[in-house]
Amino acid sequence: MSVAPETTVALQDRFFRELPELAVRWQAETFPELRLLVLNEPLATQLGLDTGWLRGPDGLRFLTGNLVPTGAAPVAQAYSGHQFGGFVPRLGDGRALLLGELVDNKGRLRDIHLKGSGATPFARGGDGLAAVGPMLREYVVSEAMHALGVPTTRSLAVVGTGRPVYREATLPGAVLARVASSHLRVGSFQYAAATGNRDLLRRLADHAIARHHPGAADAEQPYLALFEAVVAAQASLIAQWMLIGFVHGVMNTDNMTISGETIDYGPCAFMEAYDPDTVFSSIDFWGRYAYGNQPVIAGWNLARFAETLLPLFSENTEEAIALAERSFGVFQTRYDAVWATGMRAKLGLPAQVDAEFAAALIDELLALLKANHVDYTSFFRQLGRAARGDDRSAAEPAREMFMDLPGFDAWLARWRALGPDADAMDRVNPIYIPRNHLVEEALAAATDGDLDPLDQLLAAVTAPYTERPGFERYASPAPEDFGKYQTFCGT
């Protein structure tokens, strides 16, 4: 490791200075042969980073932690977590480092974080490395989520390391440079609470308020206001996942952010045929994190968050619990509002349509989609075509997706009678998402050294609402011979 000139990049070490008990100073491993696989130039510009420098030797060393700016203090962060319902008191960044924070061109403090940078004291016997495929998967999906308007961590770059990674096969290694509003998690609070150090817990809460929810500082009960703000942010986030058919796959408490951003894309995937029981993760044997369970699991995680904050709510435990339970009502209210508003937009419903009528229309449609195994993303885009005409030909692309034509036609007639707005529908219903078969195709090619399929896929999913000639295959569901899809965390 070496130190960069002061004028290159200015990183802060706010997390380490304010919460040293939650951080271990550490250095990235030195890698033999760095090769830039993908660089997010628009994001780099937002961060005030010179893209030409990032592409050069020093920039690549910076993106892998091998060149540290003067004054920076790379750390592995400590946190706990409930993993598939079981509490693990000591998790932490086993193969990641927080390089530091910088201020972007909008004045926001952002984390620069490395994934796959080598083993840390939290590695739990792992090698601390990451393979090209999983790192590029996170790059593709996180940038697609950003383009879809969903709060998410961002991907700045993926750099090949020249070091082999030994998994089920020998794979080329890579480091992902990730950008986030912060990496504070529910698990961060669980770790602080487990220490029994009330001062640490309070400082962590104050840090979270200052960084993410500053309005809570002026509330009569700031820590209760923090809890309510996180509950509201997560309720909104999960509703947005549900609206686009996103399945996170590993909703452990250490993967739930205080900022309300989506984080950690290991076993994630997008649902194709609509089914609330959709599961992709190879280790989610009981469907705990199935698509339809995501709101319930989010609530469960937030209850664990509330438990950590009880000492800050009140010295009286019963009173603290009562306050938490009352505040938790924010979740369902916010979730229902974001979901209902989003579904109305997906259906192009005018504002004057009665809420109860709209809810019944939505429920009936979802039942039809499930019963007919209809591709979720394609359907809503094709339905927009049906809103552009009253004849059967305009509706035919959507009708062709159903076996129960009488059932769908009856629903279609009621929907058309409401005067849906086709242009509004096209603004919220994507035509391109990271289709599972196309992601696998791009990752396999990239692992073999061919980045063209990755570049094409990124071109599609980072402009998801604009239909373009030559991109037809990126709008199509997986072929039947693709089979049942499973994902793996890549650890």
Swiss-Prot record:
The lineage of its organism: Bacteria, Bacillati, Actinomycetota, Actinomycetes, Mycobacteriales. NCBIfam families: PRK00029.1. Transmembrane segments: none annotated. Its EC number is 2.7.7.-, 2.7.7.108. Belongs to the SELO family. The keyword Metal-binding applies. The keyword ATP-binding applies. InterPro entries: SelO. It holds the Pfam family SelO. Mg(2+) binds at residues 255, 264. The active site is at residue 254. Keywords: ATP-binding, Magnesium, Manganese, Metal-binding, Nucleotide-binding, Nucleotidyltransferase, Transferase. This is Protein nucleotidyltransferase YdiU. The gene is ydiU. It catalyses: L-seryl-[protein] + ATP = 3-O-(5'-adenylyl)-L-seryl-[protein] + diphosphate; L-threonyl-[protein] + ATP = 3-O-(5'-adenylyl)-L-threonyl-[protein] + diphosphate; L-tyrosyl-[protein] + ATP = O-(5'-adenylyl)-L-tyrosyl-[protein] + diphosphate; L-histidyl-[protein] + UTP = N(tele)-(5'-uridylyl)-L-histidyl-[protein] + diphosphate.
